[in-house]
């Protein structure tokens, strides 16, 4: 279970501070949680605070009873928190197969790696040996990143606006991926989205 106690975050803006989050108290023990709302509401900031990418100005974060407030993003990842960025990172020199294998944390075969790609709507044979570089579109990178999260199968998987950059892949297929993930993993899924239709998974 994830618990946030009195979480606040202030961003510096010149000589002043802008309050992004204020006294957030939240418990997440459900299988699926979605934060929806307009731009600038602090949704992505809250997700990054949970993942350890941003340090809160005030408050504490607990994961399964352990205070993880001071832990780095790497340490939180080791404890079972995955984070999928709104704009996925490119890795020149690393193939899609390599990336999925690294994400899984174990040696996996081609067929298993391909199965993760198929689950996110990619033709595995066209992508498995490609480099994760600028030759891939934003939508392709997004789907590959979701495949790595599926491979990790962590206790808490956070997706920051997963629909961003997906042009040719329908939103309905994206929802189908999360529905499948919801059935397969034992952990919780936290999605940040502008699309209220994502709530249909819950």
Show the residue positions of the predicted features:
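ABC ATPase NBD coupling module
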Residues: 67-82
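Conserved structural motif at the start of ABC-family nucleotide-binding domains
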Residues: 2, 19-23
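Helix-to-loop junction immediately C-terminal to a conserved catalytic motif
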Residues: 51
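Walker B catalytic motif
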Residues: 161-162, 169
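ABC ATPase C-loop
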Residues: 149-150
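Q-loop/switch helix immediately C-terminal to the Walker
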Residues: 87, 93-109
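The feature captures the beta-strand-to-loop junction immediately N-terminal to the Walker
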Residues: 36-39
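Conserved ABC transporter NBD signature motif
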Residues: 59-66, 79, 112
